[in-house]
Every structure is written in structure tokens, then in C-alpha cells.
């Protein structure tokens, strides 16, 4: 089938399975193994959407067949080779990583669900506890080391994957029992070998003490500083296998968002929206979320990482649903904002259209070579223009207000981040937007009375303060060459240090938002004459009840442009689904 990479589908209602029935264009038995379908997926940059002469209805079975199809072995050896390229390793070297063990809460025999160390998984594909991995650089020999199955433990917890099962799922040179890893290290580490570790604490200890690696090797022979940046740099550009897993995570997440839209008129509390989303993901084989679900109604939507999800929906205008499941340890990240009753208030619709334009214009600008921070500035410029039209911002030109950073009162976070094994994935040797030392920002300094506050919990988006935004603007004004031309290596002044360019096969989010968080705006903008003069409080008073609007999609950077992987309904399509609704409650036997 020509252009089988692009399969488009829409969900249709059926008496039995309303949520997962799919109208598929061009899907037949030969195309079921093609890259994942996408609802109205946007692909731009010289790639034409295919047209198909045949359409047929396909139900739950076909979607699940595609979702669960075998993708081949996890490319662990390819990943190891990518790491070595970034490592610039000597001819004689060996990489050694330990995976995680089962976690326990302090002073308890219980613990959270197991979650594998992501750098370890990248080099092994082993998503279970008690493992290690070694990579002999000159021999290109990758070994995963696993525990033996203990019948006493299997009685309680079941068996862990066998040597044969690990070999069948991961492209590795060998799989062995971890009992023998010490013997292997002793045999393969010579005075000429450099042992690469993530951290000094991971230095293996050999017995007797005279064989301890800390004793045998000194100085540069144990390298605990080079491996971490090398792995993080390698993870930035995704392999085709990784992209396939992210596609599935985003596709399932998009269906779960649609599920919530279909049910929302029948729900009465934020927790029910949370339950519908997460329950659908679990039912389709995705028990883990990439991050804690945010189901924020009304003013709660102005809290960026709202966690309670326990407030009644009665009397609220909108819901902001930020949720994404994992698939095969790879994350998704999608946000939709919608009116709970299927019809916007005047103020809510106005703000939604602002954010809609912010996202549309930034996504349309994505292509390889683009400086990501300039996309953030595009979103900010659109926000300034639109908020001036509404009268919320005034008393200055758009350039003046942007240069002051005042729009950060309403758009206080970064445009997006990488997505991969983590929802806020590593960015390599360059920051996508901000340096880690600057991500905590402005007014945190004022809040705490000290230079910085500790990093917040569950932080998956970076704060952008007026100072940060002003620094980005100054940098852009000095950056006279085109986006695709490499600039001087001289770092811009603090706090802004992010100069990462988009490259093919990066996956990033684009998640602009406008928020009306009263304590933040009043404390750090309306009380500051430098910003207060640009904010019309009489007009602003009409918008507090909107809370916040955010729209977030996962974007794959392609050779000539981008592909929007996210197919969750938004805009008019979302309103249509809300108002069509479904009869009954989600547990009535449907979906």
C-alpha cells in the first residue's frame, strides 16, 4: 500500500464498543504492522497525506491488535553504540550499569510499584528488578545480567523473565546470571581498561578486598563523569523502535482523552474524570501513567501541577485534563481544556482561542535547525498580541511588553520539553529552554527570601519568569543570523543558557497556556510597578473564573518539518464529542 506510514482513523459509536471502534482508511491485513494510525494526524514539511479508495469499520480487536503487535527486539545494542559515539571512549573500555531493585517505603514492608532506572533500560530493555548490564566497547559485546528464579520467591511474586525470554525481547549479545558478574569483571578489567560508571556509588566491589576495583584502579581508569552526559546525549534522538513505542503511548492516551470527553457530562467530580482516563488505559494494557493525572476544574486549572483531583464539577466552567500513559516504558504527554457543559463562556472561549493560536503558530514553525527557545518567543508574542486585543494587557507596544517579560504573569512556564523514557526526557548537553540553575526562577527568590527554592515535586515543566523571558528576548535580538546557521559557542548571560536546535527524530511537546492564578499574579506582578502598568485589572477581573487553558501535543521532528503524533480531539471537534455524549455511565457495559 502506497504511503502506508500514514493511516488515518476516526472513532465511531457502536452499540457494543463505542470508544474503540475505528473507521480506518487503508487498513488491511498487510498494513496492520505499519506505523501507528493517528486521528487527523498532522504531518508537515513536504509529506503529503495519502488518499485511500477504501474505508472500513474496524473495532476494538483491530486497534488492540495494532497496539500489541510485536515490534521486534528492543535495540539495546544500537543504543549502546550510540552512547559510545557520544562517549568518545578509548579503544579499551567497559560500561557497567546496575538496574533498580524492588523499592520499599521507609520503615515499611510495602513499596511503590517497580519502575526501572531509565538509563539502564535504554541499554538493556530489561524492565524488572535485580539486573545489571555490561558493554565491552572494543568487542561491541552487550550482556544483560539477571537473577536466577527462586522457587520460594516465585510462590509469592511469580517468576521473572528467563534468559531465553530476555534474549527474545532485547537485541543483546548475551544474557547471563548476575551471580557471575563479579567473575566477568575481574576477568575483563585490566590496567589498560577504563571502567565507565554513572556514579562512584556504582563501583562494583570484588572480594577478597585485594581485588576490589577501588584498590586496583586509580584515577582515570574508573570514569564516573563521562557516562551520564553520553547516555543523555544519545537519548535525545530517538530510534525508529523508540518512536513506535511513543506513538503507541500517544495513540492510547489520545483515545483515553476522547473517552473522558464522551463521558464528561455524566461526571460530577474531578476524581471521576481521573478514573475514566486511567481506567481506560489500564483496560487496554497500559497500567502505568507517565506522570500523575491532572484533572483540574475551574480555578484549579490555574495551578500548573494540581494534584488533588477531588473537587465537584458543579458550578465550574472548564476542565483542564493533563494525562498520558506509558507504553513499553515510553511516555506520552497530552493536555486538553474544554467546557464541562459543551459550550464555552465568552471569556473562556476567548482565552481558548488565544492558546489555540499560540499552539498552532509554534507547531507550524517546527523544523530541523530551529532554535526551540525562539518558538517559545513566538508563543509569547502571540499571547501579548491577543491579550492586548482583549484589553488584559495595555499601556505599551507589544515589543515593549514582551521585552519586559510581563506576559509571564499569564504564561509562566516553558513551551515544552523532550518526551521519551521520561515524560520530561533528557535534553543532552544543551538545554531545550533553560539551564537547571535557572528553572526555579523569579519570584521564587522573593518567595523564599533566598536565592533559590528546592526543585518542586513532580516538575514536568519549567518555570519561565519575567527575567528569563526578557533574557530570551535580548538573546533573540542579538541573534542576527538565521535559525539554521550555527551560532557562536559563547554562552548568553544568565539566567538563559538554552540553545538547543531541533533535529530529526526528536520528540518534543508544544504546550502553551494562559493562566489566571490570582496569588501569583497579585503578589509578583500587580504589586510590581514595572509590570502592573501593563495589566488592566478591570478587564482582568472578568477572567479569573476561567482558571487556566493549556493545549499540549507531542510532536515528532521529521526530515522536512514535523508530525503531530497527538490525535486527542480539541477545539470544535472536542465540543462536538462532548455534546453528542453517550448514554449512561462508563460502567454500564460500554467500552
Curated annotation (Swiss-Prot):
Annotated positions binding Mn(2+) 2: 322, 333, 552
UniProt GO molecular function: manganese ion binding; metalloaminopeptidase activity
UniProt keyword annotation of Lipid metabolism present: no
Alphabetical GO biological process terms: proteolysis
Lineage top rank: taxon: Eukaryota
Enzyme Commission identifier(s): 3.4.11.9
UniProt cofactor(s): Mn(2+)
Cofactor stoichiometry and binding remark: Binds 2 manganese ions per subunit.
Region (Disordered): 31-59, 441-460
Pfam families in the cross-refs: AMP_N (PF05195), Peptidase_M24 (PF00557)
Catalysed conversion reaction: Release of any N-terminal amino acid, including proline, that is linked to proline, even from a dipeptide or tripeptide
Top-tier EC class: hydrolase
Composition-biased stretches (Low complexity): 441-450
SUPFAM superfamilies according to UniProt: Creatinase/aminopeptidase, Creatinase/prolidase N-terminal domain
Record: residues binding Mn(2+) 1: 333, 511, 552
Family according to the record: Belongs to the peptidase M24B family.
Task performed by this protein: Catalyzes the removal of a penultimate prolyl residue from the N-termini of peptides.
Name this polypeptide is given: Probable Xaa-Pro aminopeptidase PEPP
Gene responsible for this protein: PEPP
Amino acid at each position: 500500500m502506497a504511503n502506508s506510514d500514514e493511516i488515518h482513523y476516526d472513532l465511531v459509536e457502536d452499540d457494543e464498543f463505542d470508544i474503540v471502534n475505528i473507521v480506518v482508511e487503508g487498513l488491511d491485513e498487510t498494513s496492520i504492522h505499519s506505523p501507528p494510525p493517528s486521528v487527523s494526524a498532522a504531518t508537515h514539511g513536504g509529506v503529503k497525506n495519502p488518499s485511500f479508495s477504501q474505508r472500513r469499520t474496524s473495532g476494538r480487536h483491530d486497534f488492540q491488535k495494532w497496539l500489541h503487535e510485536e515490534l521486534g527486539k528492543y535495540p539495546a545494542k544500537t543504543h549502546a553504540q550510540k552512547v559510545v559515539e557520544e562517549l568518545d571512549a578509548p579503544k579499551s573500555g567497559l560500561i557497567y550499569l546496575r538496574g533498580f531493585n524492588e523499592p520499599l517505603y521507609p520503615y515499611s514492608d510495602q513499596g511503590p510499584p517497580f519502575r526501572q532506572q531509565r538509563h539502564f533500560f535504554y541499554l538493556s530493555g530489561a524492565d524488572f528488578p535485580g539486573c545489571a548490564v555490561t558493554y565491552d566497547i572494543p568487542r561491541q559485546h552487550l550482556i544483560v545480567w539477571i537473577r536466577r528464579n527462586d522457587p520460594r520467591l516465585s510462590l509469592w511474586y511469580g517468576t521473572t523473565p528467563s534468559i531465553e525470554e530476555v534474549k527474545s525481547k532485547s537485541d543483546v549479545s548475551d544474557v547471563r546470571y548476575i551471580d557471575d558478574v563479579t567473575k566477568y569483571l575481574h576477568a575483563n578489567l585490566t590496567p589498560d581498561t577504563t571502567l565507565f560508571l554513572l556514579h562512584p556509588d556504582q563501583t562494583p566491589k570484588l572480594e577478597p578486598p585485594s581485588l576490589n576495583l577501588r584498590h586496583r584502579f586509580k584515577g582515570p581508569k574508573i570514569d564516573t563523569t563521562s557516562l551520564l552526559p553520553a547516555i543523555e546525549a544519545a537519548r535525545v534522538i530517538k530510534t525508529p523502535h523508540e518512536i513506535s513505542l511513543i506513538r503507541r503511548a500517544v495513540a492510547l492516551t489520545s483515545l483515553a482523552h476522547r473517552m473522558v470527553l464522551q463521558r464528561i457530562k455524566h461526571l460530577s467530580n474531578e476524581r471521576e474524570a481521573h478514573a475514566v482516563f486511567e481506567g481506560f488505559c489500564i483496560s487496554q494494557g497500559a497500567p502505568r501513567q507517565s506522570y500523575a493525572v491532572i484533572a483540574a476544574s475551574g480555578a484549579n486549572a490555574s495551578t500548573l501541577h494540581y494534584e488533588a483531583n477531588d473537587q465537584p464539577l458543579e458550578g465550574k466552567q472548564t476542565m483542564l485534563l493533563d494525562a498520558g500513559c506509558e507504553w513499553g516504558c515510553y511516555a506520552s504527554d497530552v493536555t486538553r481544556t474544554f467546557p464541562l457543559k459543551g459550550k464555552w463562556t465568552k471569556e473562556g472561549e476567548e482565552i481558548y482561542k488565544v492558546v489555540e493560536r499560540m499552539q498552532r503558530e509554534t507547531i507550524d514553525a517546527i523544523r530541523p535547525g530551529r532554535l526551540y527557545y525562539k518558538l517559545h518567543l513566538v508563543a509569547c508574542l502571540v499571547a501579548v498580541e491577543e491579550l492586548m486585543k482583549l484589553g488584559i494587557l495595555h499601556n505599551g507596544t507589544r515589543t515593549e511588553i514582551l521585552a519586559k517579560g510581563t506576559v509571564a504573569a499569564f504564561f509562566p512556564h516553558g513551551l515544552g520539553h523532550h518526551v521519551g523514557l521520561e515524560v520530561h526526557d533528557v535534553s543532552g548537553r544543551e538545554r531545550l529552554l533553560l539551564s537547571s540553575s535557572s528553572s526555579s526562577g523569579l519570584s521564587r527568590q522573593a518567595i523564599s527570601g533566598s536565592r533559590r527554592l528546592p526543585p518542586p515535586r513532580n516538575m514536568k515543566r519549567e518555570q519561565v519568569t519575567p527575567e528569563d523571558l526578557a533574557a530570551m528576548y535580548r538573546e533573540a535580538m542579538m541573534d542576527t543570523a538565521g535559525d539554521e546557521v550555527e551560532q557562536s559557542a559563547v554562552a548568553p548571560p544568565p539566567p538563559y543558557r538554552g540553545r538547543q536546535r531541533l533535529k530529526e527524530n526528536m520528540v518534543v511537546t508544544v504546550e502553551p497556556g494562559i493562566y489566571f492564578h490570582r496569588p501569583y499574579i497579585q503578589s509578583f506582578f500587580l504589586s510590581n510597578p514595572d509590570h502592573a502598568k501593563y495589566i488592566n485589572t478591570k478587564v482582568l477581573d472578568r477572567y479569573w473564573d476561567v482558571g487556566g487553558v493549556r493545549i499540549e501535543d507531542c510532536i515528532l521532528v521529521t526530515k522536512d518539518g514535523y508530525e503531530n503524533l497527538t490525535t486527542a480531539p480539541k477545539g470544535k471537534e472536542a465540543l462536538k464529542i462532548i455534546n453528542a455524549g453517550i448514554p449512561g455511565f462508563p460502567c454500564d457495559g460500554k467500552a
